[in-house]
């Protein structure tokens, strides 16, 4: 499901675009608070 979020469409936040689909798969796996330094966006975004 792709919601028309202005944040994902922002330019400057193009990084979240990529991360957006990754977060959807990471959210169910991120039930335990795991800090991934390689993907700090997961926390922001979360």
UniProtKB/Swiss-Prot annotation:
Domain topic, free-text comment: The reactive center loop (RCL) extends out from the body of the protein and directs binding to the target protease. The protease cleaves the serpin at the reactive site within the RCL, establishing a covalent linkage between the serpin reactive site and the active site of the protease. The resulting inactive serpin-protease complex is highly stable.
Domain of life: Eukaryota
Annotated protein name in UniProt: Alpha-1-antiproteinase
Site (Reactive bond): 29-30
Modified residues (Phosphoserine): 30
Tissue specificity as recorded in UniProt: Plasma.
Organism in which the protein naturally occurs: Notamacropus eugenii
Keyword annotations from UniProtKB, A to Z: Acute phase, Glycoprotein, Phosphoprotein, Protease inhibitor, Secreted, Serine protease inhibitor
GO biological process terms on file: acute-phase response
Cellular localization per UniProt: Secreted
GO cellular component entries: extracellular region
Family, per entry: Belongs to the serpin family.
MF-aspect GO terms: serine-type endopeptidase inhibitor activity
């Amino acid at each position: 499901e792709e919601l028309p979020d202005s944040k994902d469409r922002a330019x400057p936040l193009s990084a979240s675009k990529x991360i957006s689909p990754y977060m959807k798969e990471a959210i169910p796996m991120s039930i335990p608070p795991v800090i991934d330094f390689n993907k700090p966006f997961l926390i922001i975004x979360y």
